[in-house]
């Protein structure tokens, strides 16, 4: 299809939308009803992180889907390791708001529209008469893929609870190396050191997977799932940084390719 043909098709099929400043009515989104039908997952393409209109429309869309179509879960492109705080806050955990805003990385946390939606979800869950619980999940890695420190901390804290021997092994194998490795200093780490660290992180993932029943019994299903994913992210961040060339114009594509596969 030529560019002109696409433009003609898009103009003929475009649906005007409005972005009201209040949520008194959602009539502007009623056009979605026939199209949604019985669909249970809705993917919304990203136009930009930094536009009020985009963030406002997406927040209103999720509210409408929850209120009128029974949607329960909002997934955002922000760090999974840090974002567990947000997940727990929406579920009712008593956490200071400043910590929540900082936990929403990829620049989402600074936008009032996202903040307001998270508070709205928490308020929904606090209602005794709510029809179902709303949940927030982050889908990215950690620290904008610049270091693995927070992932290490999350996994080590879990290991200390469920298997002190694993926590001790992590300290011996990974603590110093994780502190050394960052995107900015990636060329100062040898290939052999990267191989050792990635191998150690992979072994941690394997041990968590093998001990699923014991670790779940010592914690919870949720704690186990979050911690396993954090361990996988720890490994993947190390791999991503190791594969990022010194010439960042080339390396940035390598970094984001590994990151996108990991997500």
Region locations from a protein language model:
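Structured catalytic-domain cores with a bias toward divalent-metal coordination
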Residues: 1-263
